[in-house]
């Protein structure tokens, strides 16, 4: 809109400047009565001087509008080229349907090298990101995984084996004839050791995760269930639907599953845990549910490291994280992660 006002104003100034210059010259060198007669002569009932002013204004509006429209076209085209350059697209002077002014072409020619520089910077940034990802993924993660493997072996070879041996010894002692007070204490000690052993297995699960490697998320969860069924007294069942899951979120979902099961083994005091994975076309649903003692979500969710960790992993992949639990009613964790239609329909 400003272009229109500027163009019309410029035309009015130019025309009226010319008009008053002619008037001044006539006043000095010619008979002024010619101009005075314009006040009395009429065209269509309008004084000639007023009619001429109206015609001049109308002409200036028409010419100024045309010029302003062309200038506006040039500016819109330049703005479009700049936006394309910012987005990393290639700018080109051949894809326009308007006649460019020389000034516009000069401005465009300064934009071309900037566009090329932006493209180079984007490629460098992408390469740096890839290099950083490779370093973190290959080296840093390998170091962390190696350390976890070492700690897991040490815990399994020492603490877990010792607790198991102590549990067997206490079971044997309980079967012998003992005095009543000691006979009452042994079951308590046995229960404590069993709980400790279960917690150690949960920690081992957290420290030494079963890697997905070339397996799908569903296959990884099934292998995890098989491994758990051999080691824990709790019944572990699963209902896994096989479908393609983007690699970028598989690891996070698998770690969430491990964290949830670890928390269940350590805290739920339940006898059964169920793991479910379903494809809902636009999203996948991961659900882990137990029949344990439950808890008050408002009191625990901000204090539990495991729950915080699961929530953060879900947020990193754009998923929603919901937990439902009531005292003596068990706990249910649900993670909904968005899926592309191409991914959800793939075999």
Swiss-Prot record:
InterPro entries: HATPase_C_sf, LiaS/VraS, Sensor_HK_TwoCompSys, Sig_transdc_His_kin_sub3_dim/P. Its EC number is 2.7.13.3. One of its GO terms (molecular function) is phosphorelay sensor kinase activity. Pfam families: HATPase_c, HisKA_3. SUPFAM superfamilies: ATPase domain of HSP90 chaperone/DNA topoisomerase II/histidine kinase. It is found in: Cell membrane. The chain crosses the membrane at residues 13-33, 43-63. Residues 150-341 form the Histidine kinase domain. It is a multi-pass membrane protein. Keywords: ATP-binding, Cell membrane, Kinase, Membrane, Nucleotide-binding, Phosphoprotein, Transferase, Transmembrane, Transmembrane helix, Two-component regulatory system. One of its GO terms (cellular component) is plasma membrane. It comes from the Bacteria. It catalyses: ATP + protein L-histidine = ADP + protein N-phospho-L-histidine. It is an enzyme of class 2 (transferase). PANTHER family: NITRATE/NITRITE SENSOR PROTEIN NARX-RELATED, SENSOR HISTIDINE KINASE NARS. Member of the two-component regulatory system VraS/VraR involved in the control of the cell wall peptidoglycan biosynthesis. Probably activates VraR by phosphorylation. This is Sensor protein VraS. It comes from Staphylococcus saprophyticus subsp. saprophyticus (strain ATCC 15305 / DSM 20229 / NCIMB 8711 / NCTC 7292 / S-41).
């Amino acid at each position: 809109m400003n272009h229109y006002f500027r163009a019309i104003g410029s035309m009015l100034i130019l025309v009226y400047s010319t008009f008053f210059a002619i008037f001044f010259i006539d006043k000095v060198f010619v008979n002024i009565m010619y101009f005075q007669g314009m006040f009395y002569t009429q065209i269509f009932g309008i004084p000639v001087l007023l009619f001429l002013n109206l015609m001049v204004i109308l002409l200036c509006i028409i010419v100024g509008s045309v010029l302003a429209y062309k200038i506006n076209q040039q500016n819109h085209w330049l703005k479009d080229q700049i936006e394309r350059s910012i987005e990393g697209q290639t700018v080109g002077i051949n894809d326009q349907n308007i006649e460019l002014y020389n000034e516009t072409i000069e401005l465009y020619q300064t934009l071309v090298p900037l566009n090329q520089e932006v493209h180079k910077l984007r490629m460098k940034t992408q390469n740096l990101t890839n290099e950083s990802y490779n370093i973190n993924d290959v080296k840093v993660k390998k170091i962390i995984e190696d350390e976890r493997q070492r700690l897991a072996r040490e815990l399994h070879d020492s603490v877990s084996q010792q607790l198991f041996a102590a549990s067997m010894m206490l079971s044997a002692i309980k079967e012998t004839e003992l005095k009543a007070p000691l006979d009452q204490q042994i079951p308590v000690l046995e229960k404590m050791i069993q709980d400790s052993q279960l917690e150690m297995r949960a920690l081992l699960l957290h420290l030494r995760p079963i890697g997905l490697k070339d397996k799908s998320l569903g296959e990884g969860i099934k292998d995890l269930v098989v491994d758990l069924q051999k080691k824990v007294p709790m019944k572990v069942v699963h209902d896994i639907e096989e479908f393609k899951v983007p690699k970028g979120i598989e690891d996070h979902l698998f770690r969430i599953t491990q964290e949830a099961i670890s928390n269940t083994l350590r805290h739920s005091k339940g006898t059964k845990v169920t793991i479910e994975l379903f494809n809902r076309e636009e999203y996948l649903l991961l659900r882990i549910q137990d029949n344990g003692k439950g808890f008050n979500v408002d009191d625990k969710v901000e204090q539990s490291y495991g729950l915080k960790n699961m929530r953060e992993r879900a947020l990193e992949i754009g998923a929603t994280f919901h937990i439902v639990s009531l005292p003596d009613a068990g706990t249910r964790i649900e993670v909904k992660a968005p899926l592309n239609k191409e991914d959800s329909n793939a075999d």
